[in-house]
A protein has these predicted regions:
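Short, conserved charged micro-motifs
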Residues: 31-33, 186-187, 244-248
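Long, low-complexity interaction regions most often at the N-terminus
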Residues: 251-255
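Short coil/turn segments at secondary-structure boundaries
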Residues: 227-231
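Anion-binding (especially nucleotide phosphate/pyrophosphate-binding) glycine-rich loop
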Residues: 2-136, 140-142
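FAD-binding subdomain of flavoenzyme oxidoreductases
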Residues: 117-218, 224
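Conserved small/polar residues in nucleotide/adenosyl-binding loops
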Residues: 265-266
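Active-site-proximal loop/hinge segments that shape catalytic or ion-binding/gating pockets
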Residues: 236
Length: 266
C-alpha cells in the first residue's frame, strides 16, 4: 500500500526535490478508506501548487489521484457536473468548455486540482468557485465516513472556507459538483485586463471560449510555465478592511474598485 523513499519533485509545482519516506498514490475511495482506517496523521498531497516543501516528509504521504468527470443532471438552461478530486483544475475547465458549459472560464489556467479548489474558494478575474458550486463529498479522517457539504456548509468567503478554519485537517475532499450554464451564458468581463485583451483580439461580442482564451493569455504574460520555472501561480490576497475604512477611501477615490466579503462583516 505504501512505497518507501519516493521523490515528490514531480508532484509539486515548485519542483522541490523533497522525499516522502512513505508514499501512497490513491486512485479509489475504497483504498483511501482503508488507509484512513489505519493512519490518522497523514500528509495529504493533491495538485502540489499551494505548498512549499522545505524538507523530506516523515509522516505517510497520501497522493490523491482519483479521476472522473460526469454529468449528473440537466435542465433546459443548466447542467450539473461532478468532478473527482484528482482531476487537474485547468483540464476540467477545458472539458467544460469543450462541452460548451459556462461558468468556470474566468478560472482558466489556475494550477492545482479540483479537490482543493473549494478549500480556499479559488477565484480570478471576478469569478469564484462558490458562484457555480453546488456541493462536495468529503471523507472524515477520524471515522472514514463520507459527508456531503452544501454551499452553506462550506462557509465560503474571500479565499476562505470551513476547511481552512473550523474543519481544517479533518476531511479529505473526494469530489465537487458544479452547476454550469448550458446556454444563455453570462459573460463576466468586468476586469479591465480582460476587456483590453478582448479588444486586442478584436472580439466585440465575446463568448465563454473568448473569455477563457483572454484569461490564459493574460496569465501566461504574467507567470512562467511551472514546468519550466517552478512557481505556485498567482498567489496573493487583496486587503480586507472595514466598511467604514472603505467609505473614507471611496470619498477620496470615488472609482476605487471593491468587493464585499461575506466572511468579514465588521
Amino acid at each position: 500500500m505504501f512505497q518507501k523513499n519516493i521523490s515528490l519533485q514531480p508532484l509539486n509545482t515548485f519542483g522541490i526535490a523533497a522525499t516522502a519516506k512513505k508514499f501512497s498514490e490513491v486512485r479509489s475511495v475504497e483504498v483511501l478508506k482503508e488507509i484512513v482506517s489505519r493512519h490518522k496523521d497523514l500528509f495529504i498531497l493533491s495538485g502540489g501548487s499551494n505548498i512549499l516543501l522545505t524538507k523530506d516528509i516523515d509522516k505517510p504521504v497520501l497522493y490523491l489521484n482519483t479521476k472522473g468527470i460526469e454529468i449528473i443532471d440537466t435542465d433546459e438552461e443548466s447542467v450539473w457536473v461532478k468532478a473527482q478530486a484528482g482531476e487537474n483544475w485547468h483540464e476540467f475547465v477545458c472539458w467544460c468548455l469543450e462541452k460548451n458549459f459556462g461558468g468556470l472560464e474566468n478560472l482558466s489556467l489556475i494550477p492545482g486540482n479540483v479537490g482543493t479548489s473549494p478549500m480556499q474558494n479559488i477565484g480570478a478575474y471576478g469569478v469564484e468557485i462558490k458562484d457555480s458550486f453546488v456541493s462536495l463529498e468529503a471523507m472524515e479522517i477520524s471515522s472514514g465516513k463520507i459527508k456531503t457539504f452544501t454551499k452553506k456548509d462550506c462557509a465560503f468567503g474571500y479565499r476562505e472556507s470551513v476547511f481552512k478554519n473550523a474543519l481544517k485537517g479533518q476531511f479529505i475532499i473526494l469530489n465537487v459538483t458544479f452547476k454550469l450554464t448550458a446556454k444563455e451564458h453570462i459573460i463576466n468581463d468586468s476586469y479591465g485586463a480582460i476587456r483590453e485583451q478582448l479588444k486586442s483580439d478584436k472580439i466585440v461580442e465575446p463568448g465563454i471560449h473568448d473569455i477563457s482564451k483572454a484569461v490564459i493569455t493574460i496569465r501566461r504574460s504574467k507567470l512562467p510555465d511551472p514546468n519550466e520555472i517552478g512557481n505556485s501561480g498567482s498567489f496573493f490576497k487583496n486587503p480586507v478592511i472595514t466598511s467604514s475604512h472603505f467609505a473614507k477611501l471611496q470619498a477620496q477615490y470615488p472609482n476605487i474598485p471593491s468587493y464585499r466579503s461575506v466572511s468579514y462583516t465588521h
